[in-house]
Amino acid sequence: MSTKELYIGVMSGTSMDGVDCALVEFDQEQVRLIAHSDYPMPADLRQKLLSVCTGQATNLKQIGELDHRLGHLFADAVMDLLSQAGVDTSQIRAIGNHGQTVFHQPNGEFPFTTQLGDANIIATRTNIDTVADFRRKDMALGGQGAPLVPAFHQSVFALQDSTTVVLNIGGIANISVLHPTRPVLGYDTGPGNMLMDAWCETHTQQNYDKDARFALQGEVNEALLNTLLQEPYLHQDAPKSTGRELFNMEWLTAKLQGQNYRSEDVQRTLCEYTALTISKEVERFRYGPTPQLLVCGGGARNPLLMQRLQQQLSHWQVSTTDAKGVSGDYMEAMAFAWLAYRHLHRLPSNLPEVTGASRLASLGVLYSKA
């Protein structure tokens, strides 16, 4: 009897540059990416989401409408993937949908996290059971609700005699530390592409700095870099997580303190800032003769950022997850397909040593197609 099952993972990250979908085959714990797609996010929807995420005035009506629109967007993305792959909905066991994070507050008196994208709409429109709301049970157990992907990394990248660190550079950068003799660790190191993208969009009207062309026109401003490195989040102990609530244009504007920096120098400095905050954390976990850093996410396509990581981590073998046979562009979408698989099989999917939760738990809520 075949144990193979098909799941779809849907991910819209902090960069909000589109919806990543991954069609994934599971044969027990063996994982194989069958097909993938990028589905564009309408510009007006992205702008409305960005305004909510950066703390601009909103109301329940707007939040409800965004939740509805995103539900339809995610359903459209799933149907587009199935059409491209020539796969019928009846063949899919479930969808794992992350949703669009608009606020994440894991600390304080009332911790909470909010992801939009009505899973009822996804399930009924696609006629596929949908698992969503993955983060809040971990938070109910005292955890950060993030990061969740290290558990998937642990299942995919076998431990060897040296440390393997999986680095995802999305809007935020996060690491999964797979040590040969110690429990898995994982946390957000700080900004990934978020500040670079925001500054680039403000000054060049491009969503991101393609091939680091803008940054390469500038030079690192050491005074500004030192100011950025004073950010208290960087000095907190793990478990910890962050997002657009902290690292946004308001934060950056405050750090610039009205100084008249050249825009290209700021871009170059932000790239250096991202590289330094990542490499400082990665270097803490060097162990064994051949420690390796596997990079995934959009930042892996930034040649300047990758060059600086290689230079700052000279004792590490730096490559992408693609070199290990796992798509770096669809890693997170694959992870949420895996989380849906774990939910339906009633298997734990958080790592308390990563998130700070009090115990293991099967994450997510099932939204039935029926």
UniProtKB/Swiss-Prot annotation:
Top-level taxon of origin: Bacteria
Matches recorded under Pfam families: AnmK
Residues bound to ATP: 13-20
Catalysed conversion reaction: 1,6-anhydro-N-acetyl-beta-muramate + ATP + H2O = N-acetyl-D-muramate 6-phosphate + ADP + H(+)
Enzyme class: transferase
A biological-process GO annotation: peptidoglycan turnover
SUPFAM superfamilies: Actin-like ATPase domain
Keyword terms, alphabetized: ATP-binding, Carbohydrate metabolism, Kinase, Nucleotide-binding, Transferase
Family stated for the protein in its record: Belongs to the anhydro-N-acetylmuramic acid kinase family.
Protein name (Swiss-Prot/TrEMBL): Anhydro-N-acetylmuramic acid kinase
Organism the protein comes from: Vibrio vulnificus (strain CMCP6)
